[in-house]
Design a protein with these regions (language model features):
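A short Gly-Trp-Pro
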Residues: 1-113
Length: 113
């Protein structure tokens, strides 16, 4: 009997210059209402998918990075400007992907704020 393969989730920026995937289930999917995240997406909230860094990889392209505050990096497509991910020193083994970049966002609905 073969082992079941982990589920693969894919995502991309608007122009498709950056594509990524992660294996398995995310650790969490949540909304953030802090000022920094709201400004980063010009919206009332930002929705993130938290995954272990070891589950994640870029398939195509590399994002640009902006350090929005000490220890906080925000990744975005240098071509179309789509916000792609967030990484912070508080979560050194995680990457927080923007929910809107998922190919099928309904696959992982938000579960909290």
């Amino acid at each position: 009997m073969s082992a079941k393969k982990p589920e693969i989730t894919r995502g991309r920026c608007q122009c498709r210059n950056i594509e990524y995937e992660f294996e398995g289930k995310p650790k969490w999917v949540m909304h953030c209402h802090c000022e920094s995240c709201r400004r980063a997406v010009s919206s009332a909230l930002a929705t993130y998918v938290g995954v272990d860094i070891g589950q994640f990889r870029y398939l195509k392209g590399e994002p640009a990075v902006y350090e929005s505050s000490p220890g906080v990096k925000r990744y975005f497509c240098p071509n179309c400007g789509s916000p792609m991910a967030y990484a912070g020193e508080r979560w050194p083994k995680e990457v927080h992907l923007f929910h809107g970049t998922l190919e099928n966002p309904e696959q992982w609905p938000p579960t909290g704020h």
